[in-house]
Curated annotation (Swiss-Prot):
UniProt subcellular location: Endoplasmic reticulum
GO biological process: negative regulation of delayed rectifier potassium channel activity; protein homooligomerization
Protein name, per record: Potassium channel regulatory protein
GO cellular component: endoplasmic reticulum
Reported function: Inhibits potassium fluxes in cells. May regulate Kv1 family channel proteins by retaining a fraction of channels in endomembranes.
Keywords: Endoplasmic reticulum
Chief location category: endoplasmic reticulum
Domain (BTB) ranges: 5-74
InterPro entries on file: BTB/POZ_dom, SKP1/BTB/POZ_sf, T1-type_BTB
Subunit structure: Can form homooligomers. Interacts with KCNA1 (via cytoplasmic N-terminal domain) and KCNA4.
Entry keyword annotation includes Endoplasmic reticulum: yes
TM ranges: none
Organism (species): Bos taurus
GO molecular function: identical protein binding
């Protein structure tokens, strides 16, 4: 049979059409024996090869044969049944991938926002289970601190101010801290810290407004609020917990060593 020849399969009532070369990738599989007529369990019915197996699960098998990758839906839960189907077709590379089931499970990304409002200042500390989330927020958040650009004149007792942009502090890979509002300096001057969070171009000094913008940013990134609590009854630090389900990676075969597998990011 030519590799470019089309083959129609009826798997449990679901009809699939593909090239014979797609089904011939693994010479030791039952699909290969099905095509050359050596496996008598498969019958030709009205021009279609009838396979008395699960057609829904076969769609994932055919996708694997076409792409050399296994990418399952986030809510997929039939790993054992799919592995049983892979064993039936004697597709050992697919069986090996399914043995890495823990890599196929969706993983939650967690974020906690600690917020403390005290007098005219507000303090933020953001913890993230995924360092990439913290890196994303660090790239979007800018702290603007008032700095005198010229001394006060005799006609004006207030010095001219400019805004110095600074990134939030990163105590570790998994958290960042920043604050906003007004604070007093050693020269008895009151200076204001503003916060800007891209793509919003506003500079906000009010802690409640900054908290709202930060929450909106996380929601737009696919996180959802799962709970709130008071961390400390003494200083009234509020904690907002967020979660985002990360889609599983695609598992791909190593093309040089068929028995090995490589994690491929989802396209």
């Amino acid at each position: 049979m030519s590799g470019q020849e089309l083959v129609t399969l009826n798997v449990g009532g679901k009809v699939f059409t593909t090239r014979s070369s797609t089904l011939q990738q693994f010479p030791g599989s039952r699909l290969m024996r099905m095509l050359d007529g050596r496996d008598k369990e498969f019958k030709m019915v009205d021009g279609q090869i009838f396979v008395d197996r699960d057609g829904v699960l076969f769609s994932f098998i055919l996708d694997f044969l076409r792409t050399q990758q296994l990418l399952l839906p986030t809510d997929f839960s039939d790993h054992l049944r799919l592995q049983r189907e892979a064993l039936f077709y004697e597709l050992n590379p697919l069986v090996d991938l399914l043995n890495q089931e823990h890599k196929l499970q969706p993983r939650p990304a967690l974020v906690e926002v600690h917020f403390l409002s005290r007098n005219t200042q507000a303090f933020f500390r953001v913890f993230g289970s995924c360092s990439k989330t913290i890196e994303m927020l660090t790239g979007r958040i800018t702290v603007f601190i008032e700095q005198p650009s010229a001394p006060a004149s005799s006609s004006n007792s207030f010095p001219q101010m400019t805004l110095l942009p600074l990134p939030p502090q990163r105590p570790s890979y998994h958290d960042l801290v920043f604050q906003c509002g007004s604070d007093s300096t050693t020269d008895n001057q009151t200076r204001i810290r503003y916060i800007s969070i891209k793509p919003d171009n506003r500079k906000l000094a009010n802690g409640t407004n900054v908290l709202g913008l930060l929450i909106d940013t996380l929601l737009m990134e696919g996180f959802h609020l799962v709970g709130t609590r008071t961390v400390s009854s003494e200083d009234r630090t509020e904690c907002y917990s967020f979660e985002r389900i990360k889609k599983p990676d695609a598992l791909a075969m190593n093309k040089t060593l068929k028995s090995e597998t490589t994690l491929m990011p989802e396209q």
